[in-house]
Swiss-Prot record:
Belongs to the universal ribosomal protein uS11 family. It holds the Pfam family Ribosomal_S11. This is Small ribosomal subunit protein uS11. Located on the platform of the 30S subunit, it bridges several disparate RNA helices of the 16S rRNA. Forms part of the Shine-Dalgarno cleft in the 70S ribosome. Part of the 30S ribosomal subunit. Interacts with proteins S7 and S18. Binds to IF-3. GO terms for biological process: translation. InterPro entries: Ribosomal_uS11 (IPR001971), Ribosomal_uS11_bac-type (IPR019981), Ribosomal_uS11_CS (IPR018102), Ribosomal_uS11_sf (IPR036967). GO terms for molecular function: rRNA binding; structural constituent of ribosome. It comes from Burkholderia multivorans (strain ATCC 17616 / 249).
Amino acid sequence: MAKASNTAAQRVRKKVKKNVAEGVVHVHASFNNTIITITDRQGNALAWATSGGQGFKGSRKSTPFAAQVAAESAGRVAMEYGVKNLEVRIKGPGPGRESAVRALHGLGIKITAISDVTPIPHNGCRPPKRRRI
């Protein structure tokens, strides 16, 4: 019985944090929420944060301030991995697009490139009908 507990103790290893100098920030800004994912060059996720995960609920999730708080949270975790330079890829029409980039710049991370990768349909699916309030 003692051997079983010894092998269980040996299996537990401390996770080694990899040191990544350059990364890519994927900012997905929808009308309802903002999702920020920081990956390495190969696309492996290092850190992520959302406006809803930062405690904002309902219509407050879709504010620029909520996107700023989420970007700061993800940026701090990425800095623990040694990230110094980031390339930003923005997707979506939401209000948190610009404030997320400004928040990352404010943390002291160098932004090397900003690109808009919003998918634009070549007359694909029919969009939802207009809201009448």
